[in-house]
Regions:
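Conserved glycine-rich cofactor-binding loop
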Residues: 36
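Redox-cofactor binding/interface segments in oxidoreductases and associated redox assembly factors
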Residues: 101, 107-108, 171
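Glycine-rich phosphate-binding loop and adjoining beta1-alpha1-beta2 segment
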Residues: 49-84
C-alpha cells in the first residue's frame, strides 16, 4: 500500500480540528436524515465550522415533529453561537421529498422504532441463551435492527436517486455493514458508511504505547467493528506491538483489564481490533457462550456487561435530550469546536479538492483480496474532488480474513432478507451468526427469529 494511505493524514488533521487549505467554492445544501437525533447538532456544527465556508442550506428531516423542532431551534442557537448565522438557512420538514431536491450531501442517522424494540432485541434472545452487550449491529439484535431499518433506508435512497441523484450520501446508521451492503445492491448513489472506531482505537493504542499520536503509523482493514490493525509502528518504523503484547500478557495490567477481549484476541490472532471488548465479543463464538467465559472475559459497561445497551439506552436517550435542552436554554455552552467525525471533513475535502484520508465502509471490489468481493469492507479511502475512493489493502492474514468472513456470511443473507422482506432469509442469516450458532441449534434459531418477528411486527410491514 502506498505510504500516504498508512497512518492518519486525515486522522491527524481531524484530531487537530483545523480545516483544510483553500476556500469553499459554492453554497451547499446539506440534508440530515433522522435530524431529531442528538447527533444532528454536533455533525452539522462541524459543517458550518468549515473554514472559508460560503454557507447554504441545512435541511433537517425527521418523522418525529417534536424532536425535529427541538433540533431546528437548537441549530439556530448553534449558528448564533459560532457566528455563522448570516451564511446558513435552516429548513425543516417531516416530508423528505420536500427537501431532497437540490441536495448536495445527505447525512443519514435514522433510527427506526426508537426505543420500542430495544427490550425485545435483548430479552427474547436471552431466553435462548444468547447474551448481548450492545446488540445492534450483529447477532439477533443486529439482525432485527436491520430488518426494521434497511427497508426505510432503501426508500430514502430511491427518493434521492429521483430527486438529487448527484448527492454524496454519508451513512452513520447501524447496523453499518448490512445497511451498506443492501444499499450497494439496490442503489447507484455515491455513498460511504462512517464509524469512529478506527479513529478512537488508533488514539487509544497510541496512548498505551506512550507515543504521540502524530508520530505513529498504522495500517487497518477488515469489516466495520472488526477491522485489524495489521501494523502499528512508531516514528522510527519499528513495530509498537511488542509493547502492547507485553501489557496484554500481564492480565492484571490496565490494558488487559480495560480491554479483556481485544487484548486476548490480539494475543491469540496477532493484531488489535477496532471495536470495544464488549461489542467485539458479540461478533465472535468464543467469549459469550458460557457463564464461566462471561465471568472470565467480560466486565461492566462496554467491557461486555450483559444487556448493557438495553438496560441503559432509555436513560442515555433522556440524558441526551436533557443536554440538548440545556444547550438551547444556555445552561450548557455551545463550543465553536469541530469534532473528529469524518462527515464535515469529507464535505470540505470534496469541495476544496484537498486530499483527506478516512476509513470508510465501501464495496470490497478488490480492496481486500481474500474477502468476498461482493461484500462490504472497512478500508482506507482517499477523498478529494473525485469523491470517496477506496484504496487497495491486499490480503489480510488468513485467520483474520476467516474471522471477518464468518460475519460477512451473516451480513450477506441479512441484506437479502431486508431487501426481499423475507422472514425465511432472516432465519437463515441468523444461523450464520458466529455467536448465535455457538449457542443454539438451527431449530432454536428459527424459533427465536419467529418470536422476534411476532413481537416487532408493527415495525416490520411487508415481511413474509
Amino acid at each position: 500500500m502506498a505510504e500516504e494511505t498508512k497512518g492518519h493524514i486525515g486522522h491527524s488533521k481531524s484530531d487537530q480540528r483545523r480545516g483544510l487549505a483553500g476556500a469553499m467554492p459554492r453554497k451547499l445544501n446539506v440534508t440530515m436524515m433522522g435530524a431529531g437525533s442528538g447527533f444532528t447538532n454536533s455533525v452539522l456544527k462541524d459543517v458550518v465550522l468549515i473554514p472559508d465556508s460560503v454557507g447554504g442550506e441545512l435541511r433537517l428531516i425527521d418523522i418525529d415533529a417534536e424532536r425535529l423542532e427541538l433540533s431546528r431551534k437548537l441549530m439556530v442557537k448553534v449558528l448564533e453561537a459560532v457566528g455563522e448565522g448570516d451564511k446558513w438557512v435552516i429548513r425543516a420538514s417531516t416530508d423528505r421529498r420536500e427537501l431532497l431536491p437540490g441536495t448536495d450531501y445527505i447525512i443519514n442517522s435514522i433510527e427506526v422504532s426508537g426505543l420500542a424494540c430495544v427490550r425485545f432485541d435483548n430479552d427474547i434472545p436471552l431466553k435462548y441463551g444468547i447474551s448481548q452487550n450492545i446488540g445492534d449491529t450483529i447477532g439477533p439484535g443486529g439482525l432485527m435492527k436491520a430488518m426494521r431499518t434497511v427497508p426505510v433506508w432503501l426508500q430514502i435512497l430511491r427518493d434521492a436517486e429521483e430527486l438529487c441523484p448527484n448527492a454524496v450520501v454519508l451513512n452513520y446508521t447501524n447496523p453499518m455493514n448490512i445497511m451498506m451492503l443492501a444499499a450497494m445492491r439496490v442503489s447507484k448513489m455515491h455513498m460511504v458508511g462512517l464509524c469512529h472506531s478506527v479513529q478512537g482505537t488508533s488514539h487509544m493504542l497510541a496512548g498505551y504505547t506512550d507515543v504521540p499520536y502524530e508520530q505513529v503509523q498504522w495500517n487497518c482493514a477488515g469489516i466495520n467493528h472488526l477491522a485489524w490493525f495489521t501494523e502499528f509502528n512508531g516514528p522510527d518504523g519499528n513495530s509498537l506491538y511488542p509493547t502492547l503484547f507485553e501489557q496484554a500478557t500481564d492480565r492484571t495490567s490496565k490494558f488487559a483489564t480495560e480491554e479483556p477481549v481485544r487484548s486476548d484476541m490480539m494475543l491469540h490472532f496477532g493484531a488489535f481490533i477496532t471495536e470495544s471488548s464488549g461489542h467485539l465479543s458479540e461478533y465472535l463464538p468464543y467469549y459469550r457462550k458460557r457463564k464461566d467465559l462471561l465471568d472470565k472475559y467480560t466486565d461492566t459497561g462496554y467491557r461486555g456487561e450483559e444487556s448493557f445497551y438495553a438496560n441503559n439506552w432509555p436513560t442515555w436517550r433522556k440524558n441526551q435530550d436533557d443536554y440538548r435542552t440545556k444547550l438551547f436554554t444556555g445552561e450548557e455552552e455551545i463550543k465553536p469546536e469541530r469534532s473528529w467525525e469524518y462527515g464535515a471533513w469529507i464535505i470540505e475535502s470534496i469541495e476544496k479538492n484537498q486530499p483527506f484520508l478516512i476509513h470508510g465502509n465501501v464495496a470490497n471490489d478488490g480492496c481486500i483480496s481474500n474477502l468476498p468481493q461482493d461484500g462490504c469492507v472497512e478500508v482506507a479511502c482517499l477523498v478529494n474532488a473525485n469523491g470517496i475512493q477506496p484504496t487497495r489493502f491486499g490480503r489480510l492474514p488468513k485467520v483474520m480474513a476467516a474471522i471477518c468472513d464468518s460475519n460477512m456470511r451473516m451480513f450477506d443473507l441479512a441484506a437479502d432478507a431486508a431487501i426481499e422482506k423475507s422472514k425465511h432469509l432472516a432465519r437463515l442469516a441468523l444461523t450464520q451468526d458466529p455467536l448465535t450458532a455457538a449457542v443454539c441449534s438451527p431449530a432454536e434459531i428459527f424459533a427465536l427469529v419467529d418470536e422476534l418477528f411476532e413481537a416487532e411486527a408493527e415495525f416490520l410491514p411487508g415481511f413474509k
